[in-house]
């Protein structure tokens, strides 16, 4: 059974088994359900003998499926859910970026600015003040354009600092980074099986608006790689892909089974190239 729950990020961040996502998030999942065609099943037509494949596991979806009659043996344990929450933390992406920088030979194509994890509103305010121009603050557990806060060193508001305090109180930290001028968003998609084997499944080409997802381009890997290589040599993209695979083998294998997407973007360099 395939279960599309795009509200997953919100549910994972909240952590409550009874959390009810916003109506807009639930509507998006319902509207896109038809894309799964024959493999889609709602809670009224669950096949109890099939493996369950959800968009993302969290306490809320586990509780919903359990109430619908799914046996515990088909559901992840709370230990599994804690591992997923740990892996989906933006700290994992930061560790991945550091790993890629240390292993990719043509690192001159990688951005120089590194995101930082900050643990106090004071540190966040100092980060904003010390980086002229636009900066972005992110909730550690968030996705799809949610949990983002654009800030500027020339106009720090009480609301900005309040957002930091609230996010840190709920999630323990905030991620901070300097705004880059993005020219193309994309992702690399992988799968880890029960034996720990990692397969590269392909590329994803998509568009965003101020960090929020807007649309995907449905195309072959060859087309996507050709599109990306207008900005970055294809061999560099492949080298990054191999580095991500090694990072997954070193840091993720054994703690997670299923699909993994690594979001990336190509941005303009300091010289405008």
Describe each model-derived feature in a short phrase.
Residues 190-247:
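ATP-dependent carboxylate/phosphate-activation module, predominantly the ATP-grasp catalytic core
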Residues 25-132, 142-143:
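Conserved N-proximal alpha/beta basic substrate-recognition cap immediately N-terminal to
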Residues 1-37:
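N-terminal-proximal low-complexity accessory segments that begin disordered
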Residues 158-213, 265-273:
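Phosphate-binding site of ATP-dependent enzymes
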Residues 135-161, 187, 210-228:
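Glycine-rich phosphate-binding loop of ATP-grasp-fold ATP-dependent ligases
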Residues 248-273:
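Conserved metal-phosphate-binding beta-hairpin within the catalytic cores
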Residues 3-8, 55-60, 179:
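Structural motif
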Residues 128-151, 165-182, 262:
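ATP-grasp fold ATP-binding core
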């Amino acid at each position: 059974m395939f279960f599309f729950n795009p509200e997953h990020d919100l549910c994972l961040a909240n952590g409550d088994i009874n959390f009810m996502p916003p109506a807009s998030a639930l509507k998006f999942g319902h509207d896109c359900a038809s894309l799964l065609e024959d493999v889609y099943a709602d809670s009224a037509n669950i096949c109890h003998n099939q493996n369950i494949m959800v968009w993302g596991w969290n306490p809320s979806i586990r509780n919903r499926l359990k109430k619908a009659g799914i046996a515990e043996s088909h559901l992840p344990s709370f230990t599994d859910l804690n591992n997923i929450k740990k892996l989906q933390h933006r700290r994992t992406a930061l560790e991945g970026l550091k790993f890629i920088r240390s292993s990719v030979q043509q690192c001159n194509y990688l951005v120089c600015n590194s995101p930082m994890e900050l643990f106090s509103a004071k540190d966040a305010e100092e980060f904003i003040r010390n980086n002229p121009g636009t900066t972005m603050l992110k909730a550690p557990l968030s996705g799809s354009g949610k949990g983002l806060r654009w800030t500027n060193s020339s106009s720090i508001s009480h609301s900005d600092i309040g957002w930091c305090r609230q996010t840190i109180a709920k999630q323990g930290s905030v991620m901070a980074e300097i705004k880059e001028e993005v020219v193309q968003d994309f992702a690399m998609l992988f799968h880890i099986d029960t034996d720990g084997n990692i397969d590269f499944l392909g590329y994803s080409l998509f568009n965003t608006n101020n960090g929020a997802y807007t649309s995907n381009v449905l195309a072959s890997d060859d087309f996507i790689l050709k599109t990306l290589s207008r900005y970055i040599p294809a061999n560099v993209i492949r080298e990054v892909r191999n580095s991500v695979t090694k990072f997954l083998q070193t840091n993720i294998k054994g703690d997670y089974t299923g699909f993994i997407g690594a979001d990336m973007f190509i941005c303009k360099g300091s010289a405008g190239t």
